[in-house]
Structure formats: C-alpha cells, structure tokens
Amino acid sequence: MINIRKTHPLMKIVNNAFIDLPAPSNISSWWNFGSLLGICLILQILTGLFLAMHYTPDTTTAFSSVTHICRDVNYGWIIRYMHANGASMFFICLFMHVGRGLYYGSYTFLETWNIGVILLFATMATAFMGYVLPWGQMSFWGATVITNLLSAIPYIGTNLVEWIWGGFSVDKATLTRFFAFHFIFPFIIAALAMVHLLFLHETGSNNPTGIPSDTDKIPFHPYYTIKDILGAILLILTLMLLVLFTPDLLGDPDNYTPANPLNTPPHIKPEWYFLFAYAILRSIPNKLGGVLALVLSILVLVIMPLLHTSKQRSMMFRPISQCMFWILVADLLTLTWIGGQPVEHPYIIIGQLASIMYFLIILVMMPVASIIENNLLKW
C-alpha cells in the first residue's frame, strides 16, 4: 500500500516540501537560516498574539498597558522580552540569510531572490511599526523622524506624511493604524514566505560550490530535518540567554520614558538592525538624497543578478571576490556603529566614507573583481 503522506492532498504538500524533497548533499550550516527565519516568524506571531490580548493602541494607555503586561500579566514579562529580542534574532538570521545568498550566488534564482527582497522590506516595515507601539520617547520620535522623511518626496510629500499620520503630527490615529498594520503584516510575510519557498522548490537549492547538484541529491528528511533541529535549539538557546539575562541589552533606555512631544531626546536612533541604513541616510546632507540613498541601500539587492560578471556562480573558488565580500561585511559593521553615534566629528566623515564604500564595493569593486578572476582563469 502506498504511503498516505504521498497521496493525501494536504500531506502531499508537506511531504514534497519537508520530507521527500531532494536536497543537495553538501549544503552547509549557512543553509539553516531559512528554517530559522520560519521559526522566528512563528515565534513572533505567537508572542505578538498574546501581547495584543493585553495591549491597548491608544496614546493615553499604550505605555501603561505595556507596563501592565510586564508587571501584572502571568509571564507577561517573558512574552514581551521574547517578542522584542525575537525581532533581533529575526534580523540576525535575515542578514545571515541574505549574506549567504550574496556569497554563494543564490540571487541567480530570480523569482526567489526578488520575493526575498520584498520579504526584507516587509519585515523592516513591520519591525519599525512594532517599535512605535510601546509609545516611549524613542517610539514617538523614531516614528516622527522616519515618517517625516517621506516629506522629501517632491510635490506630494507633505500631503503623504499627513495622510500617514492621520493628522498634523504623530498622534492617536498614527498609533492605532500602526498597531493594525503591525498585526496584519506578519501574516502577509508568512504568505510571501510560502511563495518564496514555492519558487525555491521549482529550481531546488543552490549549494556552496555553485555547481548544479542534480546528480547528487539526498532526501531532506532525516538529514536536514535533524540539522534544522540543531539550528533551532541554538537559536532558542541564544534567544533565551538574551531574554533571561540581558533583556534590555539591545533596547534603548529612552523607551522607558513615556512619549513626550514637547521633549526631544538628545540622540534619536532606531533599533540596532536599522543603524546601517540610518547611517547612510544621515551621511548625505540633502534630505531627498538621504532618503534615496536609504532606499537604494536595500534596493541595490534587486540588481545583484545584473552585477554578476563572473563565470562562476559561487564565491567559493574566487579569493578576490571573497576579500571584497568580507570588506563589505566590515563596512556594514562600521555603518552600524556610526548609526548609533552622535552627529559630530569624527563620526560624520567616517559615516560618509563608509556609505561611499558601501555603494562602491557593490556597484564597482565586486563586478571588477569578478572580471579580473575571469581573466586569471585563462592563465
């Protein structure tokens, strides 16, 4: 008798995606982050759901409702901190996942890659709106500063900002709509992630060598299920270490002060995972120019397939490109550091140089390095 998992309409889908899926035999731990992102998303949806049961999206009570969750709700503190630090783990996995795609040339799967970029934008938007909800000082001023950037759009900018705010400043209407969007977006992300997976399974996974692996495939279960479980254990361990020992390590102390429109904090900055983009935004003295650079810093991922000039897909056998890649990583770390510093000398010039380097490495140095490597192959 044929196995039910291969015939049942629903189980067949799960079977083809997670059990009998043919997978390359040599994919490394860098391929674990997809499943870890799935776990992060499920964790965020669950903790978020329980937080939403006790949260009130109103300017007068939002801050107190978060305090109430932490003090009075059974295990509310752990749910709140798992949600806040879960976002950090989510972005760590996201950056690793995108970095893996860049290093091993996974962006040649165009549909999968482009949906991935949309997922990145959607996740960043969701995290930004979530940061506004506790209605602390940094929530309010972060929302004010970032939404205000849209006013740089010529002609429609000011009207657009007031439309998003639902008034003439960040207020009740803004908080309510941000809560609504923050609640619905993770489900849209989950749907997009399934489409992401659908397109990936059309082509099959890439592997570290970048060479087609059709001749050497192994079943996903048990080999990669057990590998994913190990990754999941390490993820949850790291998350719980953060939550239980240093829950406020990655947060901003200013957010423990209720939002006050009359008092601006000395240093307005977003959560750590946006600092690199924030540094690029601040490094350009012109408002519209800064906004464009901010958007392009992420949107540049879309043109990665066009910038691929190498004859090889992966960077595994390309030492010059490897150097460029790790310089880019160092540059992003530098930008992250600068984004958290005040706007003064020497941070301004470091930020400007790091921003120029970022675009220079991606748009010029990496394609040139690939061409040099192509020519070296002829020798």
From Swiss-Prot:
GO terms for biological process: mitochondrial electron transport, ubiquinol to cytochrome c. The chain crosses the membrane at residues 33-53, 77-98, 113-133, 178-198, 226-246, 288-308, 320-340, 347-367. Pfam families: Cytochrom_B_C (PF00032), Cytochrome_B (PF00033). It is a multi-pass membrane protein. One of its GO terms (molecular function) is ubiquinol-cytochrome-c reductase activity. One of its GO terms (cellular component) is respiratory chain complex III. Its cofactor is heme b. Binds 2 heme b groups non-covalently. Heme b b562 binds at residues 83, 182. Heme b b566 binds at residues 97, 196. InterPro entries: Cyt_b/b6_C, Cyt_b/b6_C_sf, Cyt_b/b6_N, Cytb/b6-like_sf, Cytochrome_b, Cytochrome_b_C_euk/bac, Cytochrome_b_N_euk/bac, Di-haem_cyt_TM. It is found in: Mitochondrion inner membrane. It comes from the Eukaryota. Its main location: mitochondrion. Disulfide bonds: none annotated. A ubiquinone binds at residue 201. The keyword Transport applies. Component of the ubiquinol-cytochrome c reductase complex (complex III or cytochrome b-c1 complex) that is part of the mitochondrial respiratory chain. The b-c1 complex mediates electron transfer from ubiquinol to cytochrome c. Contributes to the generation of a proton gradient across the mitochondrial membrane that is then used for ATP synthesis. The cytochrome bc1 complex contains 11 subunits: 3 respiratory subunits (MT-CYB, CYC1 and UQCRFS1), 2 core proteins (UQCRC1 and UQCRC2) and 6 low-molecular weight proteins (UQCRH/QCR6, UQCRB/QCR7, UQCRQ/QCR8, UQCR10/QCR9, UQCR11/QCR10 and a cleavage product of UQCRFS1). This cytochrome bc1 complex then forms a dimer. Belongs to the cytochrome b family. This is Cytochrome b. It comes from Ovis ammon darwini (Gobi argali).
